Amino acid sequence: MLPYPQIDPVAIALGPLKVHWYGLMYLIGIGGAWWLAARRLAGFAPEWSREKLSDLVFWVALGVIAGGRLGYVLFYDLPAYLHDPSLILQVWRGGMSFHGGLLGVLLCSWIFARRNGKGFFELMDFIAPLVPIGLGAGRIGNFINAELWGKATDLPWAMIFPSDPQQLPRHPSQLYQFALEGVALFAILWFYSRRPRPTMAVSGLFALCYGIFRFIVEFVRVPDAQLGYLAFGWLTMGQLLCLPMILGGAGMMAWAYRREARLAH
């Protein structure tokens, strides 16, 4: 068993002002994606200024934060937030939904694409390889918060999380997700997108791979207590929300390559 590193959730405290690691990880993720986007901009929209890129980052960040929070409220714990709506604003306590954030990014990207004369899927193919940076940073934030831990196990890398009332050795599922959704997904998309691909193929690969990775990790992750398992004694809300991503991502890639083949003839 590995010891859980005791990290204060507050990264910086200046009097009454407290900066939590969870929020800081979001800033690091957005900043890292911004930096990488600037490096890739010449191949996507050489006519865009850095100010235009900053506008895009703002819209994407808005979609991530607003969509992620509202998605968690709607998908995972609506009764609690209806009982005390002030909890919606307490983002530092955790409670962000990737799938809600994805919907927020899709909406904001659609608005941005229409305003700037870019195709929606063309823009999404540019954004997709940047997303794993934020996902990886967010999972580190979950780990520091000692939340979203996994099921009990006797594996040598199991950890006892301070927030676990049972104090059992558990899968560090946040680190599994960091490795898959952050590191592995970034590597796959980065190398795949280095060559020209059919429009929609990169974003389709993102949806497919994320859906598969998340679906797998959910088997060792403890489901949200207020939801439990939705069906079959194992299906979680996360897995249910990933099924459309897996099917949709595979369909997007198939359609993209078929369309390219038709145009080639």
UniProtKB/Swiss-Prot annotation:
EC number: 2.5.1.145
TM ranges: 10-30, 56-76, 87-107, 117-137, 172-192, 200-220, 227-247
Keyword Transmembrane helix: yes
Enzymatic class: transferase
GO biological process: lipoprotein biosynthetic process
Cell location: Cell inner membrane
Keyword presence, Membrane: yes
GO CC annotations, alphabetized: plasma membrane
GO MF annotation list: phosphatidylglycerol-prolipoprotein diacylglyceryl transferase activity
Superkingdom of this protein's organism: Bacteria
Pathway annotation: Protein modification; lipoprotein biosynthesis (diacylglyceryl transfer)
Chief location category: membrane
Keywords: Cell inner membrane, Cell membrane, Membrane, Transferase, Transmembrane, Transmembrane helix
Topology term for the membrane: Multi-pass membrane protein
Family annotation (InterPro entries): Lgt
Binding site for a 1,2-diacyl-sn-glycero-3-phospho-(1'-sn-glycerol): R139
Protein role: Catalyzes the transfer of the diacylglyceryl group from phosphatidylglycerol to the sulfhydryl group of the N-terminal cysteine of a prolipoprotein, the first step in the formation of mature lipoproteins.
Family per record: Belongs to the Lgt family.
Protein name: Phosphatidylglycerol--prolipoprotein diacylglyceryl transferase
Gene, per the UniProt record: lgt
